[in-house]
A protein has these predicted regions:
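Structural motif
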Residues: 1, 333-342, 380-383, 440-443
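Basic, nucleic-acid-interacting segments
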Residues: 1-296, 313, 334-338
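Core structural elements
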Residues: 191-204, 269-272, 306-330, 339-357, ...
Length: 472
């Protein structure tokens, strides 16, 4: 019997608002323990929460980026449960009246076609405090850090439309790109600003029944999400074939052993309306204003880059997935003749270099204007590719323009035909065997001869001109 998986995701995204959700404390969970606290986020009696307008705006922009229908009225509830990181005994969330419903994202399916995956709802939620485990003497103690308490979150709940680990991974990549474009969050799973839990069940292929699901947590990268889902699918299939009952519970992903392990029985506490936070009312006028502020989104940019710049699908994805990369690319393209050359240098040279140096595109000294200057030198045949790579490395160390670096280091390409003819005459005389091999039809011999010309010219010869001269 063949099986198929039924997968849904619950994704928590920490909004990059400057303050927490219900108070003016800085939204910086990584600061010194308990530095950013007040009576509201410490949940002291008598302290009343007030929803931040900036947080609401970031949340709505996130909903719009995910094609969700923002509700005219949403409301907060108290999600009741007891845990040391939640001393007040409830978490402010939106259960009965979420901020938005009926969103969707289109992702690339396993067969290369586009697949629409639905989002059931998006709701706002305050984050809880963080437990810090330390050793004091011979005992382990747990302390509570309230810096994270009250940090603004949105929870994105999908429909169970995914059928494979790759569906889930592509959904997360697309969501991350969309939300970053909208400016709502940085969505870094590695840094904890995006967390994803997966609900997984299996059924016979072709069936439409929804069987008992298992929740999997503790996945801190998109790759781990895919690995955890694949393992859980295989585990449930083994249980099914052994005629064991699959029970509703939560499991943790162990990235070292690459297995899921039982955590607890699945528990959902009661949710009751919160009396302290007024209903969130959103006007059509404000919604239209925010919609107009959305930038061109990744999918739109991807299609335009293919049509306008004649990039391949893969090149267009690389240049459009991140907003900063897309804007950098278009800034370079505005100054050069070949968009494909710009895309190739950004993907093959610039992005790996700044990653190795721990820089961002905003921080790198290789500005769009400087990279464009380098590419113009290649396009005009003033330098060859090897020299261009040398100049590129020097752009990180020098404030000089690419043209000045070329002059300072004597890297300008030899284009004088008399100089090149002298080199070609010499290498033909010095390499009679390679010349005869070429005349006998051994095409790789021409590559050897061009290489020898580059050696004789100390890398400054124009390889295209040298090749033409040898052939002629």
């Amino acid at each position: 019997m063949e099986f198929e998986a039924v997968i849904g995701l619950e994704i928590h995204v920490q909004l990059n608002a400057p303050t927490k959700m219900f108070c003016d404390c800085p939204n910086r969970p990584g600061d010194r323990h308990n530095l950013n606290t007040c009576p509201v986020c410490l949940w002291l009696p008598g302290a009343f929460p007030k929803l931040s307008q900036t947080v609401l705006e970031k949340a709505v922009m996130t909903c719009l980026a995910l094609n969700a229908k923002v509700q005219p009225v949403s409301a907060f509830d108290q999600k009741v449960y007891y845990y040391p990181d939640l001393p007040k005994g409830f978490q402010l969330s939106q259960f009965h009246k979420p901020l938005a419903r009926d969103g969707w994202l289109e992702v690339a399916a396993d067969d290369g076609t586009l697949k629409r995956l639905r989002i059931r709802e998006i709701h706002m939620e305050e984050d809880v405090a963080r437990l810090v485990h330390e050793i004091e003497g011979t005992q382990q103690i747990s302390l509570v850090d309230f810096n994270r308490a009250g940090a603004p979150l949105v929870e994105i709940v999908t429909e169970p439309d995914m059928r494979s680990p790759s569906d889930a991974m592509e959904f997360l990549r697309t969501l991350r790109s969309q939300v970053r474009y909208a400016g709502g969050a940085d969505c870094s799973m590695e840094q904890g600003s995006m967390r994803a839990d997966a609900n997984i069940s299996i059924r016979p292929k072709g069936s439409d029944e929804l069987n008992t699901k298992v929740e999997v947590k503790n996945m801190n990268s998109i790759r781990h999400v895919g690995d955890a889902i694949q393992h859980e699918i295989e585990r449930q299939i083994r249980q099914y074939r052994a005629q064991e009952t699959i029970v509703l519970h939560t499991r943790l992903w162990d990235p070292v052993k690459c297995v899921t392990v039982p955590m607890r029985a699945k528990f959902s506490g009661p949710c009751v309306p919160d009396p302290s936070v007024p209903d969130v009312v959103i006007s059509n006028e404000w919604l239209d204003e925010l919609q107009a502020r959305l930038p061109e989104m990744p999918g739109q940019r991807h299609a335009r880059f293919i049509n306008q710049y004649r990039l391949t699908r893969e090149e267009a994805i690389l240049m459009s997935e991140e907003r900063e990369v897309a804007e950098y690319f278009e800034a370079v393209v505005s100054k050069v003749q070949s968009p494909k050359l710009a895309a190739q240098w950004i993907s093959a040279h610039l992005l790996p270099a700044i990653r190795d140096k721990g820089q961002s595109l905003m921080e790198t000294p290789v500005t769009p204007a400087r990279l464009a200057g380098l590419l113009c030198l290649i396009e005009s045949s003033q330098i060859n590719v090897n020299s261009a790579k040398e100049v590129f490395g020097l752009l990180f160390e020098s404030d000089l323009a690419p043209e000045e670096i070329v002059e300072q280091h004597g890297l300008r390409q030899m284009t004088d035909t008399k100089e090149l003819e002298a080199i070609v005459t010499r290498l033909i005389a010095d390499n009679p065997v390679a010349v005869q091999d070429y005349r006998n039809g051994t095409t790789k011999a021409i590559g050897f001869l061009v290489g020898q010309a580059m050696r004789l010219s100390e890398g400054k010869a124009n390889p295209k001109l040298v090749r033409q001269m040898i052939i002629n």
